[in-house]
UniProtKB/Swiss-Prot annotation:
Name under which the protein is recorded: Tryptophan synthase beta chain
Keyword presence, Lyase: yes
Catalysed reactions listed for this entry: (1S,2R)-1-C-(indol-3-yl)glycerol 3-phosphate + L-serine = D-glyceraldehyde 3-phosphate + L-tryptophan + H2O
Protein's pathway: Amino-acid biosynthesis; L-tryptophan biosynthesis; L-tryptophan from chorismate: step 5/5
SUPFAM superfamilies assigned to the protein according to its UniProt record, in alphabetical order: Tryptophan synthase beta subunit-like PLP-dependent enzymes
HAMAP family: Trp_synth_beta
Organism: Actinobacillus pleuropneumoniae serotype 5b (strain L20)
Biological classification of the source: Bacteria, Pseudomonadati, Pseudomonadota, Gammaproteobacteria, Pasteurellales
Gene Ontology CC terms: cytoplasm
Amino acid sequence: MSDTLLNPYFGEFGGMYVPEILVPVLKQLEEAFVAAQNDPLFQAEFTDLLKNYAGRPTALTLCRNLTKGSKTKLYLKREDLLHGGAHKTNQVLGQALLAKRMGKTRIIAETGAGQHGVATALACAMLDLPCVIYMGAKDVERQSPNVFRMRLMGAEVIPVQKGSCSLKDACCEAMRDWAANYETTHYLIGTAAGPHPFPTMVREFQKMIGEETKRQILEKENRLPDAVIAAVGGGSNAIGMFADFIEEKSVQLIGVEPAGKGIETGEHGAPLKHGTTGIYFGMKSPIMQTKDGQIEESYSISAGLDFPSVGPQHAYLNSIGRAEYVSITDQEALDAFQALAQHEGIIPALESSHALAYALKLIAQNPDKEQLLVVNLSGRGDKDIFTVDKILNGGN
């Protein structure tokens, strides 16, 4: 695999573990990506869409009430304000433009929470590309507002009835479709995972999150934060936040995986800290798997974090100790979801609530510590209000 233009590995993680038929397709994608990155016209069009269609830059908001009684300053990077309601829109615009540049006439994608599906549907509507979204049947049920949004924007949503009917099954179906239709079709992967060049490409199309955050925090506080905190499922919002801070050794990078019903129950989605390295979804990375290599079911209250693996760059950052990965339970995330709504008037996505919950935990552990924290508020919580309502009002 040494004949790729970019390094397909992060340390031992990553690579291109796909059927032989897809190797030239991935290499063609890598070539197109490298050419686009070096093309001022492509960059100008991407930047214009981010600004005038998606609404970048997004705000960096100081929490006025959540930190009362402590010496912490807590800022939120407001990806929830982006068109589409989450950070997903950033890289989807990049990939959709790239697909168009490559002459692809059809887009496919997988989605869990439905946010990536919505972002793909809106980009395809705007760029006039037909799109098919694969979504686990279980997720179609728990994310009905997003399913309606996708269909409203002209996407075909296919509920996947196989396996656990969740995100991992949607990924497998999308990969199958791509292997059959790669000549006309671009598979628009929704996270910084999968075979090379996807993890690198998605990071590059998301890294403005951290770049903007750095500029904004220096403007407001005249210094870098002590830590940036982001939720980790596949890992795209987190790598988008971390990328520009990796070289800033004074800034702690904290990724928050879902502990679900508690790590000890086995019902979680924390492969980085509680999985083993294996091959899945076209890459070598930590996976939740049985001793004989069967992929285990991941679980999280948040559909977008319910993924049994993680992007290879996070695995690498964890292995060298540059980033710290922790986990937060459903209950802790729900508490943070309510706290932000009640005290700041912002309803966060359940995914983002995991990152917020860990920040609140840090503050509670040491209220007298003067610290500057930034949480990546990766998406808004409209899609989750029915789930939360069910739980708070005595449902399951």
